[in-house]
From Swiss-Prot:
<protein>
    <recommendedName>
        <fullName>Colicin-D</fullName>
    </recommendedName>
</protein>
<dbReference type="InterPro" id="IPR038233">
    <property type="entry name" value="Colicin_D/E5_nuclease"/>
</dbReference>
<comment type="similarity">
    <text>Belongs to the cloacin colicin family.</text>
</comment>
<dbReference type="GO" id="GO:0005727">
    <property type="term" value="C:extrachromosomal circular DNA"/>
</dbReference>
<dbReference type="Pfam" id="PF03515">
    <property type="entry name" value="Cloacin"/>
</dbReference>
<feature type="short sequence motif" description="TonB box">
    <location>
        <begin position="17"/>
        <end position="24"/>
    </location>
</feature>
<comment type="function">
    <text>Colicins are polypeptide toxins produced by and active against E.coli and closely related bacteria.</text>
</comment>
<comment type="function">
    <text>Colicin D inhibits protein synthesis.</text>
</comment>
<keyword id="KW-0798">TonB box</keyword>
<dbReference type="GO" id="GO:0004540">
    <property type="term" value="F:RNA nuclease activity"/>
</dbReference>
<keyword id="KW-0044">Antibiotic</keyword>
<dbReference type="GO" id="GO:0042742">
    <property type="term" value="P:defense response to bacterium"/>
</dbReference>
<keyword id="KW-0078">Bacteriocin</keyword>
<dbReference type="InterPro" id="IPR024440">
    <property type="entry name" value="ColicinD_C"/>
</dbReference>
<dbReference type="InterPro" id="IPR016128">
    <property type="entry name" value="Pyosin/cloacin_T_dom"/>
</dbReference>
<keyword id="KW-0614">Plasmid</keyword>
<dbReference type="Pfam" id="PF06958">
    <property type="entry name" value="Pyocin_S"/>
</dbReference>
Length: 697
């Protein structure tokens, strides 16, 4: 209660004293008397009768000066019908305040940077002694600042009530070594809510307001604060230092703000009604902790600090990992998937489904088989594991030291079975009618002794591969390297991002018999199973090859034969993200032998090269270049306008013979469309004469 309990109601300001009040609702037993009503008596009997003005508001409990901490005490003991409320008088600046000195230290410190870059800096200006622990009292410390002392936002630009305004400084409570402090903080973007002050009705004069008196909410769960502003602009004649109980004024060091700062305080900017000529006021209200509260707060402070340290260390580790990842991806030429628009996705899907497209997806640790215009088959999990074992075994066989260059032919028929129904594409053979591409982890072929590092332009492998058409079936040749015919160096090609589709493009250089080739890579990882995570951002989907049935086998049968020349291989290595997404893995890609495409196979061209001279090929040495010339000469023969279909070849059922009377050359095509042979007809020989007369060759 007030030091003057028992005296009659008075007007005026009691400097340095707290007049504890609790205004009444007037709903008291025995009547319906309103505070300041016509009865002229107090709203209730003691305690508290002398703490009200005739207008029905609490008398001034304390005086607020900018930068001076004031102690406000409210009684929890209420008489029946009493109502809550507290009242202060707001004055012009007072000397001997400590906030300005602390602000100077803070500003000087900020010029050198924040103590902790992610947190505000602080300088304390008061140390708070523990509360007495009187459960019948509500104790708050209150300190104010003029608007321009906390923000550069002018009064005219403050947002509507309930919104926040950016501020440079705030007055907060902190914990340090078990002690509660008041401090000024700054150095990072901060905001404070705006509240509107409203006029207080004069209960002695219904329909009017009390002059220069307003109320505003300044702290949650406590009554609105009544502010008397009549002397706000009145100069103070003297400035003796104001000492509040339990508040020790002292300027602290420049430190990082506490990790539980503002846990026990609330601050607002109070805006007064337009036309009041009262400037907005920053008010911070602080709850003083008792010894038990201090212990709990310090424990929370320590835990928050430890949590922050752990999170910071984790953030630093993540940042370092992201930096290392970015450097690694850049070195390997790997681009992260872009953010796709609907238009980009549609373009990408359209391009990947074009008839001549060869596409790979970015599924990590996968084995893939792609064919032009028919999508990609992807092996992962157990199937990919079995294929890996298969290649490991094959690698052991083909790299026998005492054996010279070897050709290891591995039939993929045991792994992939073409399964179109008869009449619905059963004559279409991958590797003959369709260009095919096979990819796997480069480490499968490199073996344990070879380290593949990002940034290299080529990688030496003990074996290289190519896809071929063998007896109408897709097969894979593994070729031992280490000689002039089969060099060990496999080129590493980097993907180039196409901005229109978001796809990556890898350009395979031209070789003898085949032009340059563009390979498309979808950079978006493909899920192993369909998922619906709620994220419906548009992304392109790699077309899936469905024309092939796949089953897992333990070990396909292999055959090993010497080989003298294979010419230029169509293979390369590129990099993609690994399964974890933090590293990269090298992918080895092989394509068809150019001579194993369409109606031709390298084997058959090699076998029938003895007739190459009949088609104008004078070089008797068989190699990729001469075999390509032989193939092209046969194609030229078939496309010549004077070439006609004439008869069949008696040794090949269902075959067709194409004859050109100008050159006297014939080319035999098997019933399945494959090239069988070709030579020049001698009309003077019996077989030549019979063919010309009967069409039977």
């Amino acid at each position: 209660m007030s030091d003057y309990e028992g005296s009659g109601p008075t007007e005026g300001i009691d400097y340095g004293h707290s007049m504890v009040v609790w205004p009444s609702t007037g709903l008291i037993s025995g009547g319906d008397v309103k505070p300041g009503g016509s009865s002229g008596i107090a709203p209730s009997m003691p305690p508290g009768w002398g703490d009200y003005s005739p207008q029905g508001i609490a008398l001034v409990q304390s005086v607020l000066f900018p930068g001076i901490i004031r102690r406000i005490i409210l009684d929890k003991e209420l008489e029946e019908g009493d109502w809550s409320g507290w009242s202060v008088s707001v004055h012009s600046p007072w000397g001997n305040e400590k906030v300005s000195a602390a602000r100077t230290v803070l500003e000087n410190g900020l010029r050198g940077g924040l103590p902790e870059p992610s947190r505000p800096a602080a300088v304390s200006f008061a140390r708070l002694e523990p509360a007495s622990g009187n459960e019948q009292k509500i104790i708050r410390l209150m300190v104010t600042q003029q608007l321009e002392q906390v923000t550069d936002i002018p009064a005219s630009q403050l947002p509507a009530a309930g919104n926040n305004v950016p501020v440079k400084y705030r007055l907060m409570d902190l914990m340090q070594n078990g002690t509660q402090y008041m401090a000024i903080i700054g150095g990072i973007p901060m905001t404070v809510p705006v509240v509107d002050a409203v006029p207080v009705p004069d209960r002695s004069r219904p329909g009017t307001n009390i002059k220069d008196v307003y109320s505003a909410p300044v702290s949650p769960n406590l009554p609105d604060l009544v502010l008397s502003v009549g002397q706000m602009n009145t100069p103070v004649l003297s400035n003796p230092e104001i000492q509040e109980e339990g508040v020790i004024a002292e300027t602290g060091n420049y430190v990082e703000a506490g990790y539980t700062m503002s846990s026990n305080n609330h601050d607002v900017i109070v805006r007064f009604p337009e036309g009041s000529d009262v400037s907005p006021l920053y008010i911070s209200t602080v709850e003083i902790l008792d010894s038990n509260g201090l212990s709990q707060r310090q424990e929370a402070e320590n835990k928050a600090k430890d949590d922050f340290r752990v999170k910071k260390e984790e953030a630093v580790a993540r940042a370092e990992a992201e930096k290392a990842k970015a450097e690694l991806f850049s070195k390997a030429g790997v681009n992260q998937p872009p953010v796709y628009t609907q238009e980009m996705m549609e373009r990408a899907n359209s391009v990947m489904n074009e008839q001549g497209a060869l596409v790979l997806n970015n599924t990590a640790s996968s084995v893939q088989l792609a064919m032009t215009g028919t999508g990609v088959w992807t092996a992962a999990g157990d199937i990919a594991g079995n294929i890996s074992k298969f290649f490991s075994n094959a690698l052991e066989k083909v790299t026998i030291p005492e054996v010279s260059p070897l050709l290891m032919r591995i039939s993929l028929g045991a792994l992939w079975f073409h399964s179109e129904e008869a009449g619905a594409g059963s004559d279409i053979v991958p590797g003959r009618n369709l260009e095919a591409m096979f990819s796997l982890s480069a480490q499968m072929l490199a073996g344990q002794g070879v380290v593949i590092e990002p940034g290299a332009t080529s990688v030496n492998l003990p074996v290289r591969g190519q896809l071929i058409n063998s007896n109408g079936q897709l097969a894979l040749d593994l070729l031992k390297t280490g000689n002039e015919s089969i060099p060990a160096a496999v080129p590493v090609l980097n993907a180039v991002r196409d901005t229109a589709t978001g796809l990556d493009k890898i350009t395979l250089p031209a070789v003898v018999g085949a032009p340059s080739r563009t390979i498309l890579v979808n950079p978006v990882p493909q899920p192993s199973v369909p998922t619906d995570t709620g994220n419906h951002q548009p992304v392109p989907v790699t077309p899936v090859h469905t024309g092939t049935e796949v089953k897992s086998v333990e070990m396909p049968v292999t055959t090993i034969t010497p080989v003298s020349d294979v010419g230029g291989l169509r293979d390369f290595i590129y990099w993609r993200p690994d399964a974890a997404g933090t590293g990269v893995e090298a992918v080895y890609v092989m394509l068809n032998d150019p001579l194993d495409s369409g109606r031709f196979s390298r084997k058959q061209l090699d076998k029938k090269y003895k007739h190459a001279g009949d088609f104008g090929i004078s070089d008797t040495k068989k190699n990729r270049e001469t075999l390509t010339k032989f193939r092209d000469a046969i194609e030229e023969h078939l496309s010549d306008k004077d070439t006609v279909e004439k008869g069949t070849y008696r040794r090949e059922k269902g075959s067709k013979v194409y004859f050109n009377p100008n050159t006297m050359n014939v080319v035999i095509i098997k019933s399945n469309g494959e090239f069988l042979s070709g030579w020049k007809i001698n009309p003077d020989a019996d077989n030549g004469r019979i063919y010309l007369e009967t069409g039977e060759l």
